[in-house]
């Protein structure tokens, strides 16, 4: 399995948050694609 993206801290910038959500969505796509 690919590594799960690290969640940014409480003081993360909106830029970091959007990058985290983008990588999290990519990670979930990889994981669900491998499952089926």
UniProtKB/Swiss-Prot annotation:
Q: Which SMART domains did the record assign?
A: PAH (SM00309)
Name the keywords, alphabetized.
Amidation, Hormone, Phosphoprotein, Secreted
> Per the record, where is site Cleavage?
2-3
- Primary localization: secreted
Annotated Gene Ontology cellular components are: extracellular region
Q: Where in the cell is it found?
A: Secreted
- A Pfam family cross-referenced in the UniProt record is Hormone_3
- What about PTM? The peptide YY form is cleaved at Pro-2 by the prolyl endopeptidase FAP (seprase) activity (in vitro) to generate peptide YY(3-36).
* GO molecular function term, any single one: hormone activity
PTM Phosphoserine: list the residues.
Answer: 13
Secreted recorded as keyword: yes
Residue numbers bearing the Tyrosine amide modification: 36
Function summary: This gut peptide inhibits exocrine pancreatic secretion, has a vasoconstrictory action and inhibitis jejunal and colonic mobility.
Family designation: Belongs to the NPY family.
Q: What is this protein called?
A: Peptide YY
Which species is listed as the source?
Answer: Sus scrofa (Pig)
Q: Per UniProt, what is the name of the gene that codes for the protein in this document? A: PYY
């Amino acid at each position: 399995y690919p590594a799960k993206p690290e969640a940014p801290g409480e003081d993360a910038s909106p830029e970091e948050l959007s990058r985290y959500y983008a990588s999290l969505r990519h990670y979930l796509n990889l994981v669900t694609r491998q499952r089926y």
